[in-house]
Each structure stands twice: as structure tokens, then as C-alpha cells.
Amino acid sequence: GYFTRTFCKKEFKKFGINDKWVQSNISLNKKKNTLRGLHFQTKPFEEDKLVRCIKGSILDYILDLRKYSKTYMKLIKVRLSDKNFLSVYVPRGCAHGYITLKSDTILSYSVTNYYSKKNERTYSFFDKKLKIKFPVKPKYISKKDLNPKIIL
């Protein structure tokens, strides 16, 4: 067995990270090579996210869309799995997405704002500016993610 702490208010406060979670979600991806994202919400529904893979494995992507940021339009990727127990914090103003590396992958994520369909946006993973090389070929992509609402 094992024990792992998934959240510690004291640690978040030490790094100045928002910890005002309003909702926690579980997402099941049945098939390997499922691509989701890059999702974000516009004001006043911007949100911070805390993402963890509790079963399976993903390559997680965060795209900084904050025009004032030194890392504007920079993309980072982190492998999350049920083996490494890592979590990733996605600040408001950043888009988030992932590709599954195993079937039956389950994610747990908490958010600091409520979902708003009107403020939901998707930035295309396939934007040439991002120059993404996926570790596996994306096979399963939702209509929403194939036809994103925004390309900068």
C-alpha cells in the first residue's frame, strides 16, 4: 500500500498558490492516445487547476496565455502517472490539456472557479506555433477539441 498527501494548505500558502478550491472532478479516459485540450476559461471564470493522474499515465501540457507573463506562449509538459504521484498546478490564464499514454487513465483535478460554457475556450494543440511532437499519435479527439474556439 501507500499513503500520499494530495493537498496541503500550508505548502500552497508558502509558495503563494491559490487554494480556494470550489470543485473537484474525476475524468476517465477509456482509450490510450486520447487527446484533450488545450482548455481554459475567460474572465470572470478564469480558474486555477490542480491536476493528478490517479490511474494510468498522461503527458500533461500547460500553455501560458497571460500576455504580461515572461513565459507567454511557452508550453511545458509533465508526465503524470499513478507511479510518480506528481501533481501539476495550472495557474489561471493558462490553457491545459493532455494525451493519455495508457488505457483506462483516470485524472483527479480541483478548480478554483465554476464551469461556464459561455467562457470556455480551447486553444488548438495543432497550432503550428506550438511545434508539438506527441509521444504517441493522437487517435481519439472530441469534436470540441478538433474545432477549437480560439487560435491566437
Give each language-model segment a name.
Residues 1-86, 104-152:
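Non-catalytic, conserved peripheral segments adjacent to functional cores
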Residues 81-98:
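Conserved SET/PR-domain catalytic core that frames the SAM/AdoMet-binding pocket
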Residues 101:
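Basic phosphate/pyrophosphate-binding loop/patch that engages nucleotide-derived ligands
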